[in-house]
């Protein structure tokens, strides 16, 4: 089971490759968090099949896990499939029969060989403890994370593990952190600051090529459930960028209030409203787009990058800047 969030498509590409490699379900987080969509709900638990991996794939926002993804992980419920419960029940029944046979054999042996009751009891207790420890060790799902970023990720994985460790549903499955984590350097898409723009075409192509090679290795390791891998580009002073700069991003820069449309360029096609992952835009079908100013906007710039006429602006920060989405 792979949970992913994607704006401009970098992460969806990576998540899709992982789904193909592991033959596991791909689940988009965005529909469960949209204010305008009641067809998805977090009230019902997600069912984790027998031996299924649990993956989280998302872009890095401000050297952190995106706020929407953190909220989703904090609220989600995960349970094992009923077949697992049935198997455990059958295993318990089999164990009971085995224990009964074992008890009879020991009783017969005790009668014929005059074994002490104390020795027999200890042998059975040790066997039961060994079986319990073995079952417990094999019950935890393999949990991993792949995050995409234009550059470094800071303490994003530490940020993720903190959220995971506080989810009671995941705790019940023995999950308190990811077992392996990876970052992929992908083409830039954040254009909300004066010094930030999309990559030149040559660099975009190079990043995609390198990431495709790295993702192939990641897919193999995740398929094999390889634990203890931490292949991350944290960058310099990771705590500063996640704690200080990341806090500034969330508190000041994540807002839809600076978005506007140049009406002489806009054709009212509605593409921006359709691609917004959180449903924060209404428009199209003959109407200019309007940002709804609800709290879920991530300033992911998906609307900006998908506008076919480059009519969407973010204050004065996007003047003469490029557009990018994964193709």
Give the label of every model feature segment.
Residues 2-4, 8-25, 30-33, 45, ...:
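FMN-binding flavodoxin-like domain, especially the glycine-rich phosphate-binding loop
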Residues 4, 47-48, 136, 252, ...:
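Generic structural signal for beta-strand residues in well-ordered domains
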Residues 39-41:
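PRPP-associated nucleotide enzymes
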Residues 236-270, 274:
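A mid-sequence, solvent-exposed acidic-amphipathic segment
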Residues 261, 267, 271-292, 296, ...:
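Iron-sulfur cluster-binding cysteine motifs and their immediate structural context
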Residues 324-327:
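Active-site-proximal loop/hinge segments that shape catalytic or ion-binding/gating pockets
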């Amino acid at each position: 089971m792979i949970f992913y969030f994607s704006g401009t498509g970098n992460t969806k590409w990576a998540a899709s490759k992982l789904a193909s490699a592991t033959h596991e379900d791909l689940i988009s987080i965005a529909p469960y968090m949209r204010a305008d969509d009641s067809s998805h709900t977090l009230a019902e638990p997600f069912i984790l099949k027998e031996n299924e991996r649990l993956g989280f794939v998302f872009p890095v926002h401000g050297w952190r896990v995106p706020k929407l993804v953190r909220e989703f992980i904090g609220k989600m419920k995960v349970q094992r499939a009923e077949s697992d419960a049935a198997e455990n029940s059958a295993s318990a029944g089999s164990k009971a029969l085995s224990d009964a046979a074992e008890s009879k054999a020991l009783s017969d042996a005790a009668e014929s060989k005059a074994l002490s009751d104390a020795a027999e009891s200890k042998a059975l207790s040790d066997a039961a403890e060994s079986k319990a420890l073995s079952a417990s060790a094999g019950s935890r799902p393999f949990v991993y994370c792949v995050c995409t970023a234009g550059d470094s990720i800071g303490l994003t994985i530490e940020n993720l593990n903190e959220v995971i460790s506080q989810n009671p549903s995941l705790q019940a499955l023995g999950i308190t952190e990811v077992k392996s984590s990876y970052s992929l350097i992908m083409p830039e898409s954040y254009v909300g600051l004066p010094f930030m723009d999309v990559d030149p075409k040559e660099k975009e192509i190079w990043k995609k090529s390198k990431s495709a090679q790295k993702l192939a290795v990641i897919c193999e390791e995740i398929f094999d459930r390889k634990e203890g891998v931490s292949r991350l580009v944290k960058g310099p002073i990771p705590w500063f960028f996640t704690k200080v700069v990341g806090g500034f991003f969330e508190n000041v820069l994540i807002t839809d209030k600076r978005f506007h449309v140049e009406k002489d360029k806009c054709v009212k096609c509605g593409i921006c409203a359709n691609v917004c992952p959180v449903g924060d835009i209404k428009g199209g079908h003959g109407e200019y787009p309007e940002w709804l100013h609800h709290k879920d906007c991530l300033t992911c710039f998906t609307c900006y990058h998908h506008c076919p006429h480059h009519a969407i602006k973010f204050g004065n920060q996007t003047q003469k800047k490029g557009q990018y989405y994964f193709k």
